[in-house]
Structures are given as C-alpha cells and as structure tokens.
C-alpha cells in the first residue's frame, strides 16, 4: 500500500472530480427521495454515501475489464 503522509485521506486526485461526485450525490439522493442536509438522518445520508461507493466501484470494475481482484 502507498505511504500517504497527507492528513486528509479524502483528497481528490483528479481535477474536476469533486463536481462529478457532487452531481452523483444529488442524483442518487433524488432517486432515493432523500433531502440532503443537516436535518436529514445519518441513516438517510449514509445510504446516499453507500450508493456512491457502490457505483464508483462498479465504474472502476468496468474500466478494468470487469475483473475481480
């Protein structure tokens, strides 16, 4: 595993990725009927985050030829 001395492990490495992730977040929230914000339950917000992760993994698998590692 790479040695990362950065204190922020969520640092985006691709320019423009933040906007794409935000767009994905709001699209998924809309699909799930979740209004993102401070008044939303952690469970609802977490379901959106979990779905983002699931879709990003699917995209990566497609780009890598669908192989499992």
From Swiss-Prot:
The record marks 27-28 as: Cleavage. Gene3D superfamilies: Small, acid-soluble spore protein, alpha/beta type-like (6.10.10.80). It comes from the Bacteria. GO terms for biological process: DNA topological change; sporulation resulting in formation of a cellular spore. PROSITE patterns: SASP_1, SASP_2. Keywords: DNA-binding, Sporulation. One of its GO terms (molecular function) is double-stranded DNA binding. Coiled coil: none annotated. SASP are bound to spore DNA. They are double-stranded DNA-binding proteins that cause DNA to change to an a-like conformation. They protect the DNA backbone from chemical and enzymatic cleavage and are thus involved in dormant spore's high resistance to UV light. SASP are degraded in the first minutes of spore germination and provide amino acids for both new protein synthesis and metabolism. Belongs to the alpha/beta-type SASP family. This is Small, acid-soluble spore protein C1. It comes from Priestia megaterium.
């Amino acid at each position: 595993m790479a040695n990362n001395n950065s204190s922020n492990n969520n640092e985006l490495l691709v320019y423009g990725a933040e906007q794409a992730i935000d767009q994905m977040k709001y699209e998924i929230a809309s699909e799930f009927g979740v209004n993102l914000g401070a008044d939303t339950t952690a469970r609802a917000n977490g379901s959106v985050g979990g779905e983002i992760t699931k879709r990003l993994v699917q995209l990566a698998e497609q780009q890598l030829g669908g192989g499992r590692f």
